[in-house]
């Protein structure tokens, strides 16, 4: 009895570590999101060629977040980051109606990869502060999320510059990755 109580306490109070891969088309807001979570402020960004990686501490969880560039020429490199990924954050520019089909294609291509079969999916419908932004329901439809039968997924409306919705997304990740782990 004492040993199981000790194990329970260890689970409750030990820091969990989670490997998160954040991808999406170029200019969706991935790097802005990463540094808003890490530093709590808006940083000036340039297009990411390669990746940024940061550890974000939140609610007794240490998220290692890999922010990988989204330009079309470097998207084939995404697969090099798939191994051991527990959670996938797919960032969508909710204002970019012209490329939401391209975003859908890239998302589904990734989700078909064997190395990501156990990863949960969090979609950040970003740039909700813009007047023509599609809402989360419209993004869900355009990305074909309801067709993902074997995948645990969630969509969160966000605004990277204000931070709105970002921590709600991390809450969902922490609750859903830990229940799968």
From Swiss-Prot:
GO terms for molecular function: GTP binding; GTPase activity. CDD domains: Arf1_5_like (cd04150). InterPro entries: Arf1-5-like, P-loop_NTPase, Small_GTP-bd, Small_GTPase_ARF, Small_GTPase_ARF/SAR. SUPFAM superfamilies: P-loop containing nucleoside triphosphate hydrolases (SSF52540). It is found in: Golgi apparatus. A lipid is attached at residue 2 (N-myristoyl glycine). The keyword Lipoprotein applies. Strongly expressed in the leaves, young stems, roots and flowers of both male and female plants. Its EC number is 3.6.5.2. GTP binds at residues 24-31, 67-71, 126-129. Keywords: ER-Golgi transport, Golgi apparatus, GTP-binding, Hydrolase, Lipoprotein, Myristate, Nucleotide-binding, Protein transport, Transport. Its main location: Golgi. PROSITE patterns: ARF. One of its GO terms (biological process) is protein transport. It is an enzyme of class 3 (hydrolase). SMART domains: ARF, RAB, SAR. The keyword Coiled coil does not apply. GTP-binding protein involved in protein trafficking; may modulate vesicle budding and uncoating within the Golgi apparatus. Belongs to the small GTPase superfamily. Arf family. This is ADP-ribosylation factor 1. It comes from Salix bakko (Japanese willow). The lineage of its organism: Eukaryota, Viridiplantae, Streptophyta, Embryophyta, Tracheophyta.
